C-alpha cells in the first residue's frame, strides 16, 4: 500500500512525463540493452528502431502515474501488456532489472531528486507486483489447458500456402505429436526465429488465422519490403527460407482482442491488408459453430494481387446467407476493373460503410495499419457505435487512435 506522500509525489511528475516521457523511455532502453544485451533476444528490434516501443512504454508510465491512486483503473492495460509478456517469456526476475534502469533514466533525463526517485521506486514495486501476479496466472492457465504448455514449444511447418503476392500462410503442428491448446478467435502466438548470422533471436507475434479446434495452428505472414530492414529481414526469412518440414519454437496463444462468443449481436469485421488474419479466425469460427449472427465482412486491399484469402471469403459469402462480404481496392488492376471483382474503389469511407453495415448495434472488430485503424475508429465513433462494442488490435506496441 502506497503512502499518501508517495502518491502525491508520483502524481506531481505527470506533467514531466507528458513532456519528457519518450525521452526517458528511449534512454531507459539504451541503458537496459547496454547492461543486459541478452534481453535483445526477447524485445522486437523493429519496434525499438521505429520508436514504437518507447512511445508505448511512455504511455504506460504516464498512465501509471496518472492513476497511481486508483491502479484498478489500469488493470485492463496491465492485462493487455501481460498477454504480450507471457507470450514472450518475460519472467518475474526481469522486473527488478527494468525498475533499476527506469529509475536511472528518470534521474539522467529529468534530473529528478532522491525524493522523487524513492517515490517512483516504491510505486514501481507495487506496479511490478501487479504485472507479476497477473502474468503468473496467465502462465499457469496456458500450461494447464489441454494441449497447453509453458514458454516455447517446437512446431513443424507441415504446409506452406501462398495466399497473395505478399501474404503466405504457415500451418504448424507440434513436433512432439501432441495436441495443441484451444484459443479464442483473435488471439496470437509468438514465433521465435533464429536467422543464421544474426546475434540475437527474433520474436514476432502473428495472429492465428484459422478457427480453433484444429490439429494445427495457422499463421499468415506479410512479406515486408526490404531484406535490410528489421521487419523485412524476419518476414522475408519466413517467406523465402522457411520450408515445409522446418521447425519453429512457438508460444501458447495469447491476447485480449477476442471474439465475444456470448454476444448475440451482429458482427462487423473490418480489416486492412494483413489485418485480415485475426478476422479470418473470427469468421471461420462463426460459420463452423453454426452461429446465426449476421456477419458483415469488410476488407480493404491495394488490389486482388495483394488480397489474401479472397476466394475463401467469397465462398463463405455465397454459402452462408447470414454472411455479407465487401471488398475495397485502393488501386485496382486493369483485370480487377474488367472483372468487377470488388465493391468499391478507393478507401473505406464513412458514407460507404454506413450503407453496408447492418446496424450500429453490433460488435465491431477492426485491424490493419495504424492510420487505417484511426480512420475506422473515428468513423464508428461518429456513427454513434457504443465504445464497449468497438474492439481493435494493434500489430505491435499499442498506440493512440485519437
Curated annotation (Swiss-Prot):
Query: What residue spans carry the region label Reductase?
Result: 147-402
Globin domain segment(s): 1-136
What are the names of the required cofactors? heme b; FAD
Question: Which InterPro entries does UniProt cross-reference here?
Answer: Cbr1-like_FAD-bd_dom (IPR008333), FAD-bd_FR_type (IPR017927), Flavoprot_Pyr_Nucl_cyt_Rdtase (IPR001709), FNR_nucleotide-bd (IPR039261), Globin (IPR000971), Globin-like_sf (IPR009050), Globin/Proto (IPR012292), Hmp (IPR023950)
Q: Does the keyword Cytoplasm apply?
A: no
Q: Where does the entry annotate site (Influences the redox potential of the prosthetic heme and FAD groups)?
A: 84, 393
The residues listed in the UniProt record as binding NADP(+), with positions renumbered to this chain, are: 273-278
Site keyed Involved in heme-bound ligand stabilization and O-O bond activation: positions: 29
Q: Where does FAD bind?
A: 188, 204-207, 394-397
The alphabetical list of record keywords is: Detoxification, FAD, Flavoprotein, Heme, Iron, Metal-binding, NAD, NADP, Oxidoreductase, Oxygen transport, Transport
Record-level GO BP terms: cellular response to nitrosative stress; nitric oxide catabolic process; response to toxic substance
State where heme b binds: 85
Enzyme Commission number(s) from the entry: 1.14.12.17
Q: Which residues are the active-site ones?
A: 95, 135
For the FAD-binding FR-type domain, which residue ranges apply? 150-260
Record note on domains: Consists of two distinct domains; an N-terminal heme-containing oxygen-binding domain and a C-terminal reductase domain with binding sites for FAD and NAD(P)H.
HAMAP family referenced in this protein's UniProt entry, alphabetically = Hmp (MF_01252)
Spell out the family assignment given in the record's similarity comment.
Belongs to the globin family. Two-domain flavohemoproteins subfamily. In the C-terminal section; belongs to the flavoprotein pyridine nucleotide cytochrome reductase family.
Q: What name appears for this protein in its UniProt entry?
A: Flavohemoprotein
Amino acid at each position: 500500500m502506497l503512502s499518501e506522500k508517495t502518491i502525491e509525489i508520483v502524481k506531481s511528475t505527470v506533467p514531466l512525463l507528458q513532456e519528457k516521457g519518450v525521452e526517458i523511455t528511449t534512454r531507459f532502453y539504451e541503458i537496459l540493452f547496454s547492461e543486459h544485451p541478452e534481453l535483445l533476444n526477447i524485445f522486437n528490434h523493429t519496434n525499438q528502431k521505429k520508436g514504437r516501443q518507447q512511445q508505448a512504454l511512455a504511455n504506460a508510465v504516464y498512465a501509471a502515474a496518472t492513476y497511481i491512486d486508483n491502479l484498478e483503473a489500469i488493470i485492463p492495460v496491465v492485462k493487455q501488456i501481460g498477454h504480450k509478456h507471457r507470450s514472450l517469456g518475460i519472467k518475474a526476475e526481469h522486473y527488478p532489472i527494468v525498475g533499476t534502469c527506469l529509475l536511472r533514466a528518470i534521474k539522467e533525463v529529468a534530473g529528478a531528486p532522491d525524493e522523487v526517485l524513492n517515490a517512483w521506486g516504491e510505486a514501481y514495486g507495487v506496479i511490478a507486483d501487479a504485472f507479476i501476479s497477473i502474468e503468473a496466472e496467465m502462465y499457469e492457465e496456458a500450461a494447464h489447458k489441454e494441449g497447453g504448455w509453458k514458454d516455447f514449444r517446437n512446431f513443424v511447418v507441415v504446409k506452406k500456402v501462398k495466399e497473395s503476392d505478399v501474404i503466405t500462410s504457415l500451418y504448424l503442428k507440434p513436433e512432439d505429436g501432441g495436441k495443441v491448446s484451444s484459443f479464442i478467435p483473435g488471439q496470437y502466438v509468438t514465433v521465435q526465429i533464429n536467422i543464421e548470422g544474426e546475434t540475437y533471436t527474433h520474436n514476432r507475434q502473428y495472429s492465428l488465422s484459422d478457427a480453433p479446434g484444429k490439429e494445427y495452428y495457422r499463421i499468415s505472414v506479410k512479406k515486408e519490403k526490404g531484406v535490410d530492414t528489421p521487419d523485412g529481414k524476419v518476414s522475408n526469412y519466413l517467406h523465402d527460407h522457411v520450408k515445409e518440414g522446418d521447425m519453429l519454437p512457438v508460444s501458447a496463444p495469447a491476447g485480449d482482442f477476442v471474439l465475444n462468443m456470448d454476444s448475440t449481436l451482429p458482427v462487423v469485421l473490418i480489416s486492412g491488408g494483413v489485418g485480415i488474419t485475426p478476422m479470418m479466425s473470427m469468421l471461420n469460427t462463426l460459420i463452423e459453430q453454426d452461429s446465426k449472427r449476421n456477419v458483415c465482412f469488410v476488407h480493404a486491399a491495394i488490389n486482388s494481387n495483394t488480397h489474401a484469402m479472397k476466394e475463401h471469403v467469397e465462398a463463405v459469402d455465397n454459402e452462408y446467407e447470414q454472411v455479407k462480404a465487401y471488398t475495397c481496392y485502393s488501386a485496382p488492376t486493369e483485370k480487377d476493373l474488367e472483372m468487377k471483382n470488388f465493391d468499391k474503389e478507393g478507401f473505406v469511407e464513412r458514407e460507404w460503410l454506413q450503407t453496408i453495415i447492418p446496424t450500429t448495434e453490433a460488435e465491431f472488430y477492426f485491424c490493419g495499419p495504424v492510420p487505417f485503424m484511426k480512420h475506422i475508429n473515428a468513423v464508428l465513433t461518429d456513427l454513434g457505435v457504443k465504445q464497449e462494442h468497438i474492439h481493435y488490435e494493434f500489430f505491435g506496441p499499442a498506440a493512440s487512435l485519437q
